[in-house]
């Protein structure tokens, strides 16, 4: 059995506390940050806003885990306010592309683009802790400059809106029209309400 203890030093990078652990193996002791250690158990954390860096990291982790053990489940724990739609769609497409089922678990908040990733988990393997919140809404964006440039941006936002609502409707089983209407403004759901909406399959309660 591996013995693991919390390291005395917690490394701080860009204001984010990244704890390290010491993993004691038969022949040596290896220092790992806790997220890397969890990834060895096929657990990935999405605990920040979704941007290009986050998306690149998550996509790389998904592709790596799928390559070392194709078909074995991967879990993504989500506590995120959302972020870039383009970056999030990159994560979404990777989740659908790999052969491994991706289980999604909301551990606090899955809002905006993060809610799309939550509902995109493998059917029957999407869950949330009891006091989690899920929020869907229409994509936001701004434009300035010439009228033609503003029109181009507006058309793109409408395309993204339809694309995101289609994804939510397909994975949740809720009608496209209802998703469209509900997302006109911020639409917040408790864990139980998210289950009834089809965003998750189970509310996790300790037995």
UniProtKB/Swiss-Prot annotation:
GO terms for biological process: protein quality control for misfolded or incompletely synthesized proteins. GO terms for molecular function: ATP-dependent peptidase activity; ATPase binding; serine-type endopeptidase activity. It catalyses: Hydrolysis of proteins to small peptides in the presence of ATP and magnesium. alpha-casein is the usual test substrate. In the absence of ATP, only oligopeptides shorter than five residues are hydrolyzed (such as succinyl-Leu-Tyr-|-NHMec, and Leu-Tyr-Leu-|-Tyr-Trp, in which cleavage of the -Tyr-|-Leu- and -Tyr-|-Trp bonds also occurs). Keywords: Cytoplasm, Hydrolase, Protease, Serine protease. Cleaves peptides in various proteins in a process that requires ATP hydrolysis. Has a chymotrypsin-like activity. Plays a major role in the degradation of misfolded proteins. Belongs to the peptidase S14 family. This is ATP-dependent Clp protease proteolytic subunit. It comes from Bacteroides fragilis (strain ATCC 25285 / DSM 2151 / CCUG 4856 / JCM 11019 / LMG 10263 / NCTC 9343 / Onslow / VPI 2553 / EN-2).
